[in-house]
Amino acid sequence: MSIEERVKKIIVDQLGVKAEDVKPEASFIEDLGADSLDTVELVMALEEEFDIEIPDEEAEKITTVQSAIDYVTKANA
């Protein structure tokens, strides 16, 4: 499973949204109905899945599906 697929699966699981709604440009809060607690839990799930640490100042920048994919890809490089 690619990084993109794994990130999308985490988003579906964490936010309870349909896979087809998880588009690269989708905003977690505006498009997928997440609140601030959801986004914190999402970041924690990404950290656990990919065994990375995402500092708070970086986590604040992860607001869309694509930004999450990009961050994890860079962290795994």
Swiss-Prot record:
The keyword Lipid metabolism applies. Keywords: Cytoplasm, Fatty acid biosynthesis, Fatty acid metabolism, Lipid biosynthesis, Lipid metabolism, Phosphopantetheine, Phosphoprotein. The modification O-(pantetheine 4'-phosphoryl)serine is found at S36. It comes from Actinobacillus pleuropneumoniae serotype 5b (strain L20). Belongs to the acyl carrier protein (ACP) family. One of its GO terms (biological process) is lipid A biosynthetic process. Disulfide bonds: none annotated. GO terms for molecular function: acyl binding; acyl carrier activity; phosphopantetheine binding. This is Acyl carrier protein. The gene is acpP. Pfam families: PP-binding. The lineage of its organism: Bacteria, Pseudomonadati, Pseudomonadota, Gammaproteobacteria, Pasteurellales. Carrier of the growing fatty acid chain in fatty acid biosynthesis.
